[in-house]
Amino acid sequence: MVGHILQYHPAVIRLKELISQGELGKVQYIYSNRLNIGKVRTEENILWSFAPHDISVMLMLLEEEPVKVSSFGGEYLNLNIYDTTLTTLEFKNAVKGHIFVNWLHPYKEQKLIVVGSKAMAVFDDVSDEKLFVYPHTIEWKNGKTPIAQKADYVVIPVESAEPLKRELEHFIQYLRGRKRPKTDGLEGLKVLNILTLAGETLLGVKGDPQKEDKSKAYFVHESSHVDEGVWIGEGSKIWHFSHVLKGSKIG
């Protein structure tokens, strides 16, 4: 079982219900901002540190995986450690989303917004009230000009429960009943695949898109280090933030 805690958040569960019940209409766009000043890390970048939970929630809300992933960002404090990234996910039926994460931001913000054809929903995990619906609509003047019709937001009541407690209760139920958990290994693998694809495009933006040294029969990611005296088999690939010690044999 994977610890994607937001899937156990009462507001996220209620948001999923709103989408499933058609309260927002057809989902057109979804995006999240996870921003703060710190905690700055040196062993992993902001994408791998902040984005996994948002990716997990998007997959859960849309019930599908993206057909295309791209990402770009900036590294300002440490070489090869991105401090901010913007990742774009493209799904079927023209649904798109983005995930903006940043640990060099002046204030804390944790929002996920779903834009539908009938209404828009905001999950704000920093606010006292967690879930809002904005029933804004678009009307067409003379069938040609789109006019926004604004409406007051509505606070959606959600159960007051700790997501971590909910997650642990779900884990206990899984152990007792041996039923498939909501965030199982397969769900974790889907998130990991998207993170990997996003990380690959980050390198592409830098002008160094995971180029393999053709003089070698194996590939070592630029964030990894291989000691002298290591044997690496042909076709092997060593990925992010690995340290291969002297005397090791791989492949």
Where are these regions (language model features)?
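C-terminal helix-rich "cap/oligomerization" subdomain common to oxidoreductases
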Residues: K92, H170-S215
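A contiguous active-site-proximal alpha/beta segment in oxidoreductase catalytic domains
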Residues: M1-K39
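Contiguous beta-strand/loop segments that form the cofactor/metal-binding neighborhood of enzyme cores
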Residues: P52-P135, V158-A161, K165-K179, T196-A198
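Short, intrinsically disordered, charge-balanced linker/junction segments flanking boundaries
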Residues: E23-L24, G247-G251
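A structural motif detector for beta-strand N-caps
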Residues: A217-V220, S224, V230, G235-S242, ...
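A short glycine-threonine-serine/GTX helix/turn-capping micro-motif
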Residues: E43-W48, V154-E162
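Mid-domain beta-loop-alpha active-site segment that forms a flexible
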Residues: G3-P10, L35-K68, Y82-D83, E167, ...
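Glycine-/small-residue-rich active-site loops that bind phosphorylated ligands and cofactors
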Residues: Q7, P106, K190, L245
